[in-house]
Amino acid sequence: MKIIFNADDFGISPGAVYGILESYRRGVVKSTTLLANSPAFDLAVEVAKENPGLDIGAHLTLTFGYPLLQGLETLTDDNGRFRKNYTALESGLANVDMEEVERELTAQIEKILGAGITISHFDTHHSIEPLIYPVQHKLAEKYGVSIRRHSDVSDFGAIKTPDLFDTSFYADGVSFETIKKIVQEHIGTNDVVEVMTHPAYIDETLREISSYVEPRIKEVSILTSRELQAYLGQQEVEIISFRDL
């Protein structure tokens, strides 16, 4: 089997940038996805350029912070911010203009590309793929990239995806045992499994803007542990990135 350990939220805070960098340099993370509207975007770009082996994707968002474009009336609240989570976006989905979605996501992609970063894949913040999949699919075809597989989507066409997407390494599931369980479920197969991760060093920026904080430092510890790397080697698990699909 093959595993892609993808680190979400690249750029959400300086601590997240450095936590992901540590998980790449000393650990099993080979892919990460960058938030174009994040506070530490410039730092993330700098780190990405200094570490060309780190595979970069776009962490497309309609539920974090402010959009890059103005005048997106169906996607924002009265203060011009995106709705805060999946549920809030879903509840107003009937009134969402998908042309606005496409324009904003295109702007996010182009900002990353314009910073000199090559993008290999797309995923989304708060896993909103089922709500915007036709737009995401269209953009993936346009830019020639892979995307994260989602259980609510059955037809990916010619777009490359991992075979499975596993979210169990999150919150109370952040443990070495969780990864062992994932491996045991797929060992001996040719499956490519993406494991979602959120490693970060905790800083004030992260505390202010994210509800998922404390487990992130534990993720760094596990993803960089010799124990995990030895186990994956013993099980002959190949660690790859989205570039390798």
UniProtKB/Swiss-Prot annotation:
Keyword Electron transport: no
Alphabetical UniProt keywords: Carbohydrate metabolism, Hydrolase, Magnesium, Metal-binding
Annotated Mg(2+) binding sites: H59, H125
Source superkingdom: Bacteria
GO molecular function annotations of the record: deacetylase activity; hydrolase activity, acting on carbon-nitrogen (but not peptide) bonds, in linear amides; metal ion binding
Family under the similarity heading: Belongs to the YdjC deacetylase family.
UniProt-listed HAMAP family: COD (MF_01246)
Function noted in UniProt: Probably catalyzes the deacetylation of acetylated carbohydrates an important step in the degradation of oligosaccharides.
Protein name, per record: Carbohydrate deacetylase 1
